[in-house]
UniProtKB/Swiss-Prot annotation:
Pfam families: V-SNARE (PF05008), V-SNARE_C (PF12352)
Localization of this protein: Membrane
Residue ranges crossing the lipid bilayer per the database entry: 192-212
Organism in which the protein naturally occurs: Schizosaccharomyces pombe (strain 972 / ATCC 24843)
Protein name per Swiss-Prot or TrEMBL: Vesicle transport v-SNARE protein vti1
Keyword Cell cycle set for record: no
């Protein structure tokens, strides 16, 4: 985020300088430079809006406020540029003066051509605005998608960890069952031997008694 903000500050210095030059000259080259810089600034702000999804919630409010301020300033620059373009177009439209009276003059053909040019410029600007808005929405959607993917990745890791723990528990359970089976076999053997010894003792006692009373 810091990298994008540094880039924004550099672009801000450039656009403010260009807008100042435009107010003085009104040249088409300066207008094109301003439009290019505004598009770059819009892209940088769009990247900030994507990056904010990865910022901790405790810091997100402050950063989001700065981003809103950047976008508001961008809209002000766009309005300023639009006003300067209008001034430049009006100057181009009524730029010829009568040398004797000093009044602006323009032929009907020039007027029609320049009117169509202004209309075409306005349509182009509207299309550019719609394109930029679509790009901003796409950037926001991409940010939401990236956040969802991160959440899914985290859930996958948790699931894998749970499966590992379940596997360990299953292994411990198998070992416990084997131990219980071994103990049960030993208990059965001990019971068999104990029963056999008791039976032998009973037989011996009976033999002794039999020999005495014979």
């Amino acid at each position: 985020m810091e990298t994008y903000e540094q880039e924004y500050r550099l672009l801000r210095a450039d656009i403010e300088e260009k807008l100042n030059d435009l107010s003085k000259s009104g040249e088409n080259s300066v207008i094109q430079s301003c439009q290019r810089l505004l598009n770059e600034i819009d892209e940088v702000i769009g990247q900030m809006e994507i990056e904010i999804t990865g910022i901790p919630t405790s810091e997100r409010g402050l950063v989001n406020g700065r981003i809103r301020s950047y976008r508001s300033t961008l809209e002000e620059w766009r309005r300023h540029l639009k006003e300067e373009i209008g001034k430049s177009d009006r100057k181009a439209l009524f730029g010829n003066r009568d040398e004797t009276s000093g009044d602006y003059i323009a032929s009907d053909q020039d007027y029609d051509q320049r009117t169509r040019l202004l209309q075409g410029t306005n349509r182009l600007e509207q299309s550019s605005q719609r394109l930029l808005e679509s790009q901003r929405i796409a950037n926001e959607t991409e940010g939401i998608g990236a956040s969802i993917l991160r959440d899914l990745h985290g859930q996958r890791n948790q699931l894998e960890h749970s499966l590992e723990m379940l596997g360990d528990t299953s292994g411990h359970l198998d070992r416990s069952l084997r131990t219980l089976k071994t103990m049960a076999r030993r208990l059965a053997m001990n019971r068999f031997f104990t029963t056999a010894i008791i039976a032998i003792l009973v037989i011996l006692i009976l033999l002794v008694l039999y020999s005495k009373f014979r």
